[in-house]
Design a protein with these regions (language model features):
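N-terminal, charged/glycine-rich beta-strand/loop interface patches
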Residues: 2-99
């Protein structure tokens, strides 16, 4: 079984089946995903509260991928095992009216 790594350099903001797969895997392969934080780096450790007023909500919750699983067909249920999650050392949270 192979291991693949997808970096966070090509995020996309929503599920889109027209995007070409970044990697094609066989069932049982391992994929390591690097992800951006929820604002796609609009909020950084140096940000103050004022950054919330200028967030581009079209970039919120960036995704890494897509991954094509060989042999999978539309309607199939795929089992995914999350082996570990590692954070990048900081995080943020906000209550945003209307969001």
């Amino acid at each position: 079984m192979a291991t693949y790594k997808l970096d966070d350099k090509q995020p996309h903001p929503f599920w889109d089946n027209t995007l070409a797969p970044r990697v094609r895997v066989q069932p049982g392969d391992t994929v390591i995903f690097e992800t951006l934080e929820a604002s796609a780096n609009q909020v950084t450790p140096a940000s103050g509260h004022e950054v919330m007023a200028s967030l581009d909500f079209g970039l919120i919750h960036p995704l890494t991928g897509p991954v094509y699983v060989e042999g999978a067909e539309p309607g199939d249920a795929l089992e995914v095992e999350i082996i570990s999650i590692k954070h990048k050392g900081w995080g943020w949270n906000a209550v945003i009216p209307g969001f």
